[in-house]
Curated annotation (Swiss-Prot):
This is Membrane-bound lytic murein transglycosylase C. It comes from Actinobacillus pleuropneumoniae serotype 5b (strain L20). It comes from the Bacteria. The gene is mltC. A lipid is attached at C20 (N-palmitoyl cysteine). Residues 1-19 form the signal peptide. Keywords: Cell outer membrane, Cell wall biogenesis/degradation, Lipoprotein, Lyase, Membrane, Palmitate, Signal. The keyword Membrane applies. PROSITE patterns: PROKAR_LIPOPROTEIN (PS51257), TRANSGLYCOSYLASE (PS00922).
Length: 365
């Protein structure tokens, strides 16, 4: 089993705490909404500090704080003695326990059969993820016979096979022994997840006039189509929308006060709507005036990651002069400059990654 190295600071997992509730944006002048969001974060930190981190440190050790991220799902169960980890980027599922094999078996079954709605799974409670009749991982994991794992009978048989044939152990620094199984996802698991969201992507693409391939390319790079995604920047969901920045622009365009909360952005439909609308805002407002569609697309992709202001400053500190400069350049030159001269290495690589990912989805209309 590969050693966990991508551990996030405690504060980074706060955004999941509000995701189990529901929130309806209000078209009003009230400011109470913003106060509520801050209160939720404060309460979330208290819960996290008092329960989650304390339990993990005591049970697994301080160097074993594994938490959810953009492309990783992590769920603790059995009073935090068992955990499941899905790497949506690497296509690897690891389920491990400090308890007995019954706990391991139970976690295997519930992980393989969990649903796709983040509101249905409380990542901070130690209970099992609910079993769904429409498992999110269906088509992404096969059992020892190559069968799709889509019901309890097959999941139970596969769990038995794994425990009898694939069981491994490792020792923690605190001296405890972990028993675990590792499951490889099928080749093309990313594309399988992408297909689950095609109806929503097509709907939002038509609504805002954004090409589906661009939406899908951004979703792949941002979250690898992980509906539970959260990042260090407090970006939420499939398209990694940041509530306090892009979220405010999105709500303003919709005529809502404040910003979307976590529950709003963990809803796949609302998340894809929000991310696609933000692309339209970049196109129609922040980057208005760029005339070449390809050059504008490059600028939109880069701005989705680093902000429109940072993109324009690569060309000139004056917005209008920057747009004039972009219009003087060929699309290839714009791409070259954004991938070499942007001060953020993350932004430079982001444009490359999204452009490459987008190519896989050009056939989708």
């Amino acid at each position: 089993m590969k050693k966990y190295t991508k551990y996030l600071p405690l504060l980074l997992i706060i955004p999941f705490l509000a995701a189990c509730g529901s929130s309806s944006p209000k078209k009003s002048k009230r400011t109470k909404t913003r106060v509520d969001y801050n209160t939720k974060d404060t309460n979330g930190l208290d819960i996290l500090t008092g329960q989650f981190s304390h339990n993990i440190d005591d049970i697994w050790g301080s160097n074993e704080l594994l938490v959810a991220s953009k492309k990783d799902y992590v769920k603790y169960t059995d009073k935090f003695y068992t955990r499941s980890h899905i790497s949506f980027e690497d296509g690897q599922i690891t389920i491990e326990t400090l308890g007995d094999q019954n706990h391991l078996r139970n976690s295997i079954i519930h992980t393989l059969l969990m649903g796709s709605d983040p509101k249905g799974i409380d990542l901070f409670a130690s209970g099992d993820a609910p079993i769904s009749s429409n498992p999110f991982l269906a088509g992404q994991v096969n059992d020892q016979f190559g069968r799709d794992i889509n019901n309890i009978a097959i999941a139970n048989d596969f769990a038995t096979y794994l425990i009898q044939n694939k069981l491994q152990t490792r020792r923690l620094q605190n001296g405890r022994t972990v028993t675990y199984v590792a499951i490889k996802m099928v080749a093309g698991h990313i594309e399988v997840r992408a297909r689950q969201y095609l109806p929503l992507v097509r709907k939002m693409a038509k609504r805002y006039g954004i090409e589906p391939s661009l939406i899908l390319g951004i979703m792949e790079v941002e979250s690898a189509f992980n509906p539970y995604a959260v990042s260090y920047a407090n970006a939420i969901g499939l398209m990694q929308v940041v509530p306090r920045t892009a979220g405010r622009d999105i709500f303003a365009r919709k005529g809502f006060d404040g910003q979307p909360d976590r529950a709003y952005l963990y809803n796949p439909s609302q998340n894809i709507d929000s991310g696609t609308l933000y692309l339209a805002i970049l196109r129609d407002e922040y980057l208005e005036g760029i005339t070449n569609p390809t050059a504008k697309r490059y600028a939109m992709i880069s701005a989705y990651n680093s902000g429109a202001g940072a993109v324009l400053k690569v060309f000139d500190y004056d917005k209008y002069d920057a747009i004039d400069r972009i219009n003087e350049l060929s699309p290839d030159a714009v791409y070259r400059i954004l991938t070499t001269a942007h001060p953020s290495s993350q932004a430079r690589n982001y444009l490359k990654k999204v452009s490459k990912a987008r190519e896989k989805y050009l056939h989708i209309r």
